[in-house]
Amino acid sequence: MALPDATTPFTRRSARIGGITALVGAVGVLAGCALPYATITYGTDDPTHPSVFNSGFGGNTLFAAEPLAVVMFSFVAAVILLTPTRPILQSVAAGMLIAFGIQTFVFFFGYIGLGTYSDSSFKGSIGIGTIIGMLAGLCVLAGGLIALIARSRPAGSPSAESVTPGAPG
């Protein structure tokens, strides 16, 4: 059974909720990049507080391109969900948000290893940017899931289980 092109108020509202959730996540990704992802102490030196935007190491600022692309594309996908448009575009936008949400969560999750690593000359601890970035990735993911689940529900039915296949005609 094909999904109808007409959207229901539930679908429009869910797409808006998904879009707003994704926008909150995109702002959170920016905050996660600006705040320190770890506190690192080398030997007896003063601790450093690197962030994605200010790593403190030459040439590493190019790593900021990845989360900035996520913010830009998440913003575009969220706007698609917030505006009345073709259902296929909203489904594609929801899929993009799901992919970017997973990728962003894993991106910031990787900084946990740096933050928790310690040996005789290196001490690390997790920074607030890591936590905010991971939560922001989950917000982007949730925005896409909310919109996609709403798109997959047939019009007029409370749940997908109540749909019965139509007789061949």
Segments from the language model and where they lie:
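Compact integral membrane and secretory-pathway proteins
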Residues: A2-G169
